[in-house]
Amino acid sequence: MSLKYDPDDSLFNASWATVLLSERDVAGQIPINFVTTSAISLRAACFGDNKFGRIAAEKCLSNLLAVGYRRFNIDLYWSPELSRWILCPVSIPEGLDVVKTSAEATPTATAEIAEGTVIAQPDESSGELLYDLGPYKCSNSLDLQDLLNVFLDYFKYTDTDLVIYTKFLSLNLHAAADPTSIDEPASNVPSEQLPVESNRVSSILEGYLGSYIYGPSNLLKDRRNLNDSWYVVDDGYKPIIEYFTIEENFEGIQSTPDGWPSMKYIQLAAERRLLVEYGSVDPQLGNYDLSVENEVIFPPGYLTSTIPVAAADDGSLDSGCLYDPDTTDISRINASWAMSNHIPIPRNLSNESFRYISDLVVNLTACGMTSTLNETLFGHTADVTPDPYRNLTLSSSWAWALGQPAAPVSDLDSAESDEKRCAIMDLSLDGHWRTANCSETRRAACRVDNQPFRWALSSEPLSYEDAYNDACPPTTEFSVPRTGLENTYLSRHLLSQSPDLIDPTSSEPLKHEIWIDFNSLDTETCWVAGGSHATCPYTSDPDKLQRRTVLVTAVAGIVICIIAALTLFVKCNANRRNSRRNKRVIQGWEYEGVPS
């Protein structure tokens, strides 16, 4: 029976839907190589106890997808005996006798099993039969196809604009160990025992997820002629060109040697959901030719740039941060596909230990890096204890302060009210965002020459609407940070201003609150850039307002608080009469923000 996307029901909570959707959308035109996310090792999160069962793997991967992990490092083992890519590090032999014992089998009884047999016991939690292979307990059927079935079901389950997120796979290829010599390195796999065409990783991926994959061939074709690729789509899907190099030939055709498409281009224009690269490849598989798979899978390390990082005891970074106070030139800031090399995990689960990890992930994201979890959290895998994993991935949220965006507190007609419908950067909250009344007067954040990291502060305080039209001087425009690193550059620029203008410790809001171009005036909880007349993209097309169940369950699955003390709440009143309030709401649901 094929595995499915089947996360724990307890993970579903819609309170963070606005946060995740708004961050996805504000970064929607940034080339994907500059957008940070959260990465995780499947080996650590799902098999840290050395148990490789199908039932547990289905639940674990489903939970990780549900709580918002978008990049997965996966270890695959080629078993010549089985002619399959398996998840267990040891090949399960087909020619040996299988001795089934109960879970209560004594060590003496086990020791009496004759050599040349394999012991199998039912797993205590799932009842699935697992084979004892040295330090490992493995299902005889957990393989690459099983994982891809979970991804396939997930993609089908989240197929509306509101809940689409691009995923990334980094595949590490190994040779499975011989079950008769588990403690020894795997032998070299001769050419005749390597995968045939139908068993190559690219062939399997193409067969299961081909319609979702954006591969090297797609990138090469798009880069060669931007006039016929990234430039011919909706303006809102085009990548921000200041992030990459553009060349033009004598015919006026533009190309790029280093550009990447934006998330909106991949998801909405190209209708793709997945990018795959090879990570490491064991020398025992040295004859496995990766070059023939370049249609589907990127070469080793193509989607990864590992940044060495040193962290202090409080979770701040001693070294490795990509913010450079001496330059705003993006060509000198190597943030493309930037990944942290390690997240140190304390042994014991406590409020203090989790706060340290959370603070570290927050700082890595602010410094322009994707955080990578390569260890099992506090000794518990995500199929059994998913809470720490969901808390950690939400720590990579970079924009809103805790409890934000706050919902309007008034029962008046919020369709005509500007209460809590515009965003400010609050320097008293470490540069995170919160909501404010749009009629309040503040200075505005002005982007210089459309450059990602160059900012100016407007001279006069104005309302949000007036700020969009009149605040910013020539060669600048009212704007909003679109990534964690852009946000850091803006907040650091503001902090460099005279204390007469900016003072995070001041009780005067004018000195620590700055307008950014982000509002939900058109549709409550639908946050958009473009001034007070910008419209919500999810209410203009009836086709985008289908499948409310998907919105409530799939989006909600990537939701929880960053710290244990935060209480989550979502208010749904689908039957509210609209005689007094003509409020427009995404998908008919009233997302009231994240309570503080």
What are these regions (language model features)?
Residues 1-71, 78-202, 263, 269, ...:
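Long, acidic (Asp/Glu-rich), low-complexity accessory segments flanking structured domains
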Residues 73, 168-172, 445-447, 517:
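Residues within well-ordered beta-strands of beta-sheet-rich folds
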Residues 75-78, 486:
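Alpha-helix capping/helix-boundary segments
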Residues 202-596:
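Extracellular, disulfide-bonded carbohydrate-recognition/adhesion ectodomains
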